[in-house]
Amino acid sequence: MNKRKCTVESTDYEVEFPMTVSATVRCPIELRKLNLNKDTRSSLIKLILEHGDEQNHSSNVKADMTDWFMHTRYKEFKELSIFTEALSKKISKDNIDVMTFDCWGAVYRKGEETIKHTHWGNLWSWCYYLKVPIDSPPFRFEDIGGGEAGKTASFDIYPQEDDLLMF
């Protein structure tokens, strides 16, 4: 088993990996190593870099971001989407149809961020980490509940290369 750093408010924890955080944080969170082959990862990186910032920082992602529908144009994105669809069915334990609506890539540089937002209307969302510099900020879940006296808390996950984070 690997361990990953997670932070709740200002307290750091080392947690076993892969992990699933239960619905006590309003939605399940699944973090696991994908073990995607190096050629596919290299191809995904190349495609994302070639597309550059097609959104002009106009979405919640204030960094270079491709178009929303890369899975409809490139087999590498489609394969990644198919895997996450299968995993979401397994995690849900319900016989529900899932489909990828949008799938895109982003490149963050120092000082860039994604602003706080929700994924209302989506049962599952996910991030796949192709490269993660050592000083990268965590993925933060805001207002997860479960804080002291009914207060909300934040929950930070520090992904590593080849991690898949589903929520």
Question: Which residues does each PLM region occupy?
Answer:
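Catalytic core of non-heme Fe(II) oxygenases with the double-stranded beta-helix
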Residues: 98-167
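Non-heme Fe(II)/2-oxoglutarate
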Residues: 2-95, 113
